[in-house]
């Protein structure tokens, strides 16, 4: 009888621990979807391992889709929030907006709306900033790069100013297409995010 009681208590503790796990939702594009790599090799998978190794009870949901834009992320977000109920939302979008020459003002509006929707559901928000290559022209690049800081200030979200710091344009860090981070870059991407993400946990 005592053994059964102890077994029941242990099961209750385990169930309670499982129920306590919070969700971290990543909404991104091909960079976070680890295009060209196995998803288990991407920075988001490395983040899940880092959280476990450091004792953070989080379940990471990677809702990143290759080719996605800020408009696509905004359209998908309400259903993701309802289904996953995240405590923290990481937004990594805008690169495809820039590559398509979309208006920075529209990008800013979309990202701000995503942050507002996430915060309305009680989630903290971390925005990962993207910069464009120099061939897009200084005026467009400057307007684009200002978007992320403006959204972070307006919506009071955490910000990584340049997610691809030490990766973009660096020899050996990019795949052959020159756009997507290589396997060697994935740990660096995690390190770019971690110092800003950790205080939000």
Swiss-Prot record:
The name of this protein is: Esterase TesA
Pfam families linked: Lipase_GDSL_2 (PF13472)
EC number(s): the record gives 3.1.1.1
Q: Where is the protein found, in the record's own terms?
A: Secreted
Query: Which gene carries the instructions for this protein?
Result: tesA
Reported function:
Esterase that exhibits the highest activity towards Tween detergents and p-nitrophenyl esters of short acyl chain length. Also displays a low thioesterase activity towards palmitoyl-coenzyme A, but is not active towards acetyl-coenzyme A.
Describe the reaction catalysed, as an equation: a carboxylic ester + H2O = an alcohol + a carboxylate + H(+)
Q: Which GO terms describe its cellular component?
A: extracellular region
GO function terms (MF aspect): arylesterase activity; carboxylesterase activity; lysophospholipase activity
Chief localisation class: secreted
> Which spans of this chain does the record mark as coiled coil?
none
Q: Which organism is it from?
A: Pseudomonas aeruginosa (strain ATCC 15692 / DSM 22644 / CIP 104116 / JCM 14847 / LMG 12228 / 1C / PRS 101 / PAO1)
